Design a protein with these regions (language model features):
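Conserved ABC ATPase signature
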Residues: 136-140, 144
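Conserved ABC ATPase "signature" region
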Residues: 66-67, 103, 107, 114-131
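A short, surface-exposed alpha-helical micro-motif characterized by mixed small hydrophobic
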Residues: 203-205
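A short, proline-enriched helix->beta-strand linker immediately N-terminal to the Walker B motif
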Residues: 155-159
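ABC ATPase "signature
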Residues: 221-222, 230
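Helix-to-loop junction immediately C-terminal to a conserved catalytic motif
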Residues: 51
Length: 348
């Protein structure tokens, strides 16, 4: 559906800036695709290259089989009708009602009043604004304003919806409702949605795949589940850790003395990660039953990512050192990830 091939963007001037550096991505039809990065990472420039609001310095932008970089100005205007966009700050016309804001792009396209009404009435119903059609932006909450922006973007019946930090100006509860709306639109209309954000929680909630961008370069890309369960780059680990932490809380670390070596009187401190059906594995019970170990659980939790359960445990394997080693060997035979963090004082 969307293919970016070797996209680069350079802003020339006294302070030359390489905003994007040789980026290649493929976004399949019907996906919700997230691009995450900190301020200045290049994510806004990248998403604006998809609809050519920013023309790349080099590379190809192929949307639904058409390379937008090769189109004339008039051809590009036609192609953009199939690419909707919503913005962080809504960009509504204060002098127009909800209905007239949504109708505005269709008026520019020359549709009749009857055609416009037929087009946008069901859209206003989908976004939950049927009872607000005569309200002005000043009479709306932030979430309602964003719903107007979404309705306006959908009015042209796009195949692609671009979301430029669409929830970053909203409170958490409103953000949740907007994300639910985007999921509903994706499922109901089969829209391909590309969103940029600096919030990993947004990625976790609705995205099928995610790309992590930093300094104009894609650091890491994969399914949301893959990236959450196995982040490779430090930046990605920081993003994931802001939402799902599998590290021992600082409060707990302050009460234990961690050793690098397994010395007398210490026991292994082990991090365990389970995905999918592996969360049903009775690991702790197995260690107690098979090896007569006293397993102390210091930290644990289960999250759900892309409808898949992801569990985490940090445990101490107290007991006879030989039995503890056998327990570690046993853990490594299971369909779970494990890591010995270090060694702590064993309980008596």
């Amino acid at each position: 559906m969307i293919t970016l091939e070797h996209i680069s963007k350079v802003y020339e001037g006294a302070n030359r800036v390489e905003a994007l550096k040789d980026i290649s991505l493929t976004i399949e039809k019907g996906q919700i695709y997230g691009i995450i990065g900190q301020s200045g990472a290049g994510k806004s420039t990248l998403i604006r290259c998809i609809n050519m609001l920013e023309a790349p310095t080099s590379g190809s932008v192929i949307v639904d089989g058409t390379d937008l970089t090769k189109l004339s100005a008039s051809e590009l205007r036609k192609a953009r009708k199939h690419i909707g966009m919503i913005f962080q700050h809504f960009n509504l016309l204060s002098s127009r009602t909800v209905y007239d804001n949504v109708a505005f792009p269709l008026e520019l396209q020359g549709l009749s009043k009857a055609e416009i009404k037929e087009r946008i009435t069901p859209i206003l119903d989908i976004v939950g604004l049927s009872d607000r059609v005569n309200n002005y932006p000043s009479q709306l909450s932030g979430g309602q304003k964003q719903r107007v922006g979404i309705a306006r973007a959908l009015a042209s019946h796009p195949k692609v919806l671009l979301c430029d930090e669409a929830t970053s100006a909203l409170d958490p509860q409103t953000t949740e409702s907007i994300l639910e709306l985007l999921k509903d639109i994706n499922e109901r209309m089969g829209l391909t949605i590309v969103l940029i954000t600096h919030e990993m929680q947004v990625i976790r909630e609705i995205c099928d795949r995610v790309a992590v961008i930093e300094g104009g370069v894609i650091l890491e890309e994969g399914s949301t589940l893959e990236v959450f369960t196995n982040p490779k780059k430090p930046t990605t680990k920081d993003f994931v850790g802001s939402v799902v932490s599998d590290n021992l809380p600082q409060e707990a670390l302050e009460h234990i003395e961690l050793h690098d070596d397994w010395i007398a009187g210490t026991a292994p401190l082990v991090k365990l990660k389970f995905t999918g059906q592996a969360t049903d594995e009775p690991v702790v019970a197995g260690l107690v039953r098979r090896f007569d170990l006293d397993v102390s659980i210091l930290f644990g939790g289960i999250d759900y990512i892309q409808n898949t359960s992801v569990g985490r445990l940090i445990v101490i394997l107290n007991g006879d050192p030989m039995k503890a080693q056998e327990g570690l060997d046993y853990i490594r035979t299971l369909p779970i990830e494990s890591e010995v963090i270090g060694y702590v004082r064993a309980s008596n």
